């Protein structure tokens, strides 16, 4: 994982940023940007994503970190559109997308998920920087 994050920073100047707990510096997870390209009508693009340790879910870390990433991108990064997507059942992640001001675009069937799988259907959100 470290090599992939490092590679994105070297290639694009952005990637996943470590999220730490303010009180003690404990590692919470990652939030940041990822280039994506798969067979959908909104690709290629830049995704904002968050991956946190489960013990830190539902405590505001993803929202705070994602807002900080979007603010940073507006001033410092070379793109103007950011996407976020998640499986339809992942309501907590959808709430983060809404809280950081992203707009719902549509539902779509993720081409990398097997047909018939319960996580095949995804929701797509968009933010213009």
Over which residues does each language-model region extend?
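Active-site rim helix/loop that mediates acceptor-substrate recognition in acyltransferases
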Residues: 1-13
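Acyl-donor (CoA/ACP) binding surface of acyl/acetyltransferases
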Residues: 18-129
